[in-house]
């Protein structure tokens, strides 16, 4: 078993500083945050230690990332991006899905082979309606993962942010019953 962490906790660090920290503390791997470049909407979102789009376009950048981590004896075990892929705002949904697909492609290009993410949830819809939405949203994401030979790991955190948020959270798959249906 390897011990690692999600790099989003080191939100003020560069990719090199994050990998150096992991190495110095004796971690064997990291789940590297890959949010789109720009301002965060919530805590830990917006952290981008690896720029997925750049990793797809710039071969030297992709090689540098993998070689730097390898030289520090730190494996990049997964690329991490946890958006709400079922956001009721269709423009937001389209934007996050396209970035998630690019994170999947980058994971393949970097030889990582794993992306960690959420299913998401339309907080204004019922569980049953969200289960139908999964059937609309996720096939194209899974298709990209299959094409790139990248596995997807789904986190089941309910994403409950506080009393001002709807009690169902922002992630559909938080119970065994819902997991079985998905």
Language model features with spans:
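Structural motif corresponding to the early beta-alpha repeats
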Residues: 27-139, 146-151
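Loop/helix-junction capping segments adjacent to catalytic residues or to phosphate/diphosphate-binding pockets
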Residues: 12-13, 124
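N-terminal beta1-alpha1 ligand-phosphate binding loop
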Residues: 6-10
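N-terminal amphipathic alpha-helix/helix-capping segment at the start of soluble metabolic enzymes
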Residues: 1-4, 69
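Short secondary-structure capping/turn segments at boundaries of alpha-helices and beta-strands
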Residues: 18-19, 65
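Acidic/histidine-rich catalytic cores of soluble enzymes
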Residues: 2, 13, 17, 23, ...
